[in-house]
């Protein structure tokens, strides 16, 4: 659902057992990704054109793949109540990872539906002080009448993880025989931080409703005498309310700061205890009207206009050496206006474009324009009855133009170890993407170009920076799927990307993902997929991770990458039960010991994961 205008698009639920086990791993989330090593740990997508737009609460960006977004909420329409249970377990003993998912949804009738889901992970981690314990829960309800429609969802997440700052010495992994202690157990490797935690809590409420204005018209099937009335929506009045509350807490218990003297040069309010607290509240409401597509033969597009109000509230520690820790507040009020042009009813040509600008408030002058066009070109033999062509090529184009102020927290921030006060310029982005795909051969080519002025990033010292020169980013992504009969499948993806200044934006020049699998059945009822998935990035100056601010910072001393990560798996499906077995990092010690994701964060060693999904329909 478009969180601004309420336009919905159909979504297909994921019921496939294919690649089930591999989907649990962090490396499968993007073609290029850095993270701190554990499941649901802080991460940064290094496939540049797959990055999400940064959140105004900068601490949430470390969990971009997992944070709540109303536009990604799925609403199910099911004749029968359904419960989907999923559980997976990885490792053993003090290194066990447990992952539980519960998803329930159902309908009272065709108009009213409800649902709720729970996602809980307790990943103890292979290395010391690296556990993660995220919890996500959401519930929704909707009503879809002939004229009035409303959707509501409430979600909360608690993303908690220990921070170890990476292992203290890269030699523990690169040259383990050089140490008398011979750190064969990663839990025994000393780390840069101890007794350190990050907690990021998010609460989100979204309510969207609309009322259709139109006429009732008689409908009938050709050759049938039955007649019924059908409502034809000519225009729609829509309105939404969105409330979001995020809170971040960075904690180093008594004595932990003393062991971190080498990491942090400053202690602005306490040398033995750190308890940084920052919060963000955002209330926004939008209202508008649109002329709907398809109410007559001349209405080939939907055209809408909207206006909205946004209020943001930031709270952080007071910049003072007094022990009162008085909270410092900042309020931002903005008025937005914009419009949308869309075309969704056609199967051959679709358009979706949205533009908005801040006309009042702190962000006045901000512009956000996005657009997407998809064209299907059919060819081949035409069906005698329907006239549908047997083949097609799909061409897609995406474009974006943004002129936006940085987050308030990029300009102003105070904590025990970091403080800054900036007056950054607006960042301008012009992005153009194109994709050509041929579904029959499972082939696609994607090209992206972005031009950036005033790029903002975090430098090697952990402080925000502005790159005053122009910068360009280019990416080429190619995907090809191959089948040999019905039993052998080979999927490949290659990403080539570069930026004009890799000291500011370092990206792996080549990233590869390859998945080779065999498909067969046992006793005609058990479907099996067995295979291996490989991930590879060329070596580059991967960023450092700063636990105190949860930001990824540039560094130019240690290259990471050039390590082939290989996972073997077996996925099975037996009616409504799916189960899998995965062996992660099968090539450990076979190729090289240099298996670092970031300078001091290595991959986890070889380990086994297994799990099951149960689909219950009442």
Q: Where in this protein do the model-derived segments appear?
A:
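Membrane-proximal, glycine/serine-rich, low-complexity loop/turn segments characteristic
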Residues: 1-203, 211-220, 228, 378-389, ...
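Structured extracytoplasmic
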Residues: 27-55, 256-270, 278-282, 286-294
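Exposed, low-structure sequence patches enriched in small/polar residues
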Residues: 80, 195, 199-255, 265-266, ...
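A generic membrane alpha-helix/interface feature
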Residues: 135, 171, 258-260, 416, ...
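Short, solvent-exposed beta-strand-terminating loops
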Residues: 157-173, 242-258, 538
């Amino acid at each position: 659902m478009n969180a601004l205008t309420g336009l919905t698009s159909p979504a297909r639920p994921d019921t496939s057992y294919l690649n089930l086990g591999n989907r649990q791993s962090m490396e499968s989330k993007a073609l290029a990704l850095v993270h701190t090593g554990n499941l649901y740990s802080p991460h940064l997508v290094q496939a540049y054109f797959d990055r999400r737009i940064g959140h105004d609460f900068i601490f949430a960006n470390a969990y971009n793949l997992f944070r709540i977004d109303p536009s990604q909420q799925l609403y199910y329409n099911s004749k029968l109540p359904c419960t989907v249970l999923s559980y997976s377990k990885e490792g053993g003993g003090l290194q066990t990872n447990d992952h539980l998912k519960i998803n329930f949804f159902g309908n009272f009738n065709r108009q009213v539906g409800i649902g709720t889901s729970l996602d809980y992970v307790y990943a103890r981690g292979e290395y010391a002080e690296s556990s993660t314990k995220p919890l996500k829960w959401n519930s929704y309800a909707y009503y879809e009448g002939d004229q009035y429609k409303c959707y509501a969802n409430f979600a909360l997440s608690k993303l908690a993880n220990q921070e170890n700052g990476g292992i203290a010495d890269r030699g523990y992994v690169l040259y383990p025989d050089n140490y008398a202690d011979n750190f064969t157990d990663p839990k025994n490797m000393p780390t840069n931080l101890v007794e350190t935690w990050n907690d990021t809590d998010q609460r989100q409420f979204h309510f969207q409703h609309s009322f259709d204005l139109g006429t009732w018209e008689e409908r009938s099937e050709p050759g049938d005498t039955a007649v019924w009335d059908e409502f034809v929506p000519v225009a729609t009045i829509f309105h939404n309310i969105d409330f979001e509350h995020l809170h971040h807490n960075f904690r180093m218990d008594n004595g932990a700061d003393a062991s971190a003297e080498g990491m942090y040069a400053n202690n602005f309010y306490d040398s033995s205890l750190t308890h940084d607290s920052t919060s963000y509240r955002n209330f926004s409401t939008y209202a508008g009207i649109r002329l709907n597509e398809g109410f007559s033969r001349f209405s080939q597009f939907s055209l809408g206009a909207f206006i909205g109000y946004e209020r943001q509230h930031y709270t952080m520690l007071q910049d003072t050496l007094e022990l009162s820790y008085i909270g410092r507040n900042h309020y931002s009020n903005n008025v937005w206006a914009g419009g949308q042009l869309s075309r969704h009813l056609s199967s051959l040509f679709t358009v979706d474009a949205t533009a908005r600008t801040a006309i009042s408030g702190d962000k006045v002058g901000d512009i956000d324009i996005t657009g997407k066009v998809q064209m299907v070109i059919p060819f081949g033999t035409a069906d005698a009855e329907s006239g549908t062509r047997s083949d097609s090529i799909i061409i897609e184009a995406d474009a974006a133009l943004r002129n936006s102020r940085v987050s308030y927290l990029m300009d102003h921030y105070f904590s025990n170890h970091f403080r800054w006060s900036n007056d950054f310029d607006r960042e301008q982005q012009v992005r153009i993407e194109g994709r050509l795909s041929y579904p029959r051969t499972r082939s696609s080519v994607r090209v992206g170009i972005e031009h950036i002025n005033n790029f903002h990033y975090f430098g090697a010292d952990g402080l925000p920076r502005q790159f005053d020169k122009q910068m360009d980013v280019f990416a080429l992504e190619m995907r090809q799927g191959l089948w040999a009969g019905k039993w052998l499948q080979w999927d490949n993806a290659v990403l080539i990307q570069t930026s004009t200044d890799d000291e500011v934006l370092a990206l792996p020049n080549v990233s590869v993902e390859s998945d080779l699998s065999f498909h067969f059945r046992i006793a005609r009822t058990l479907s099996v997929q067995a295979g291996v998935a490989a991930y590879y990035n060329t070596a580059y100056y991967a960023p450092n991770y700063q636990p105190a601010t949860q930001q990824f910072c540039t560094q130019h001393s240690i290259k990471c990458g050039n390590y082939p990560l290989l996972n073997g798996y077996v996925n099975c499906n037996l009616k409504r039960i799916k189960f899998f077995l995965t062996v992660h990092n099968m090539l450990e010690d076979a190729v090289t010991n240099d298996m670092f994701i970031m300078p001091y964060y290595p991959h986890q060693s070889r380990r086994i994961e297994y799990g099951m999904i149960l689909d219950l329909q009442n």
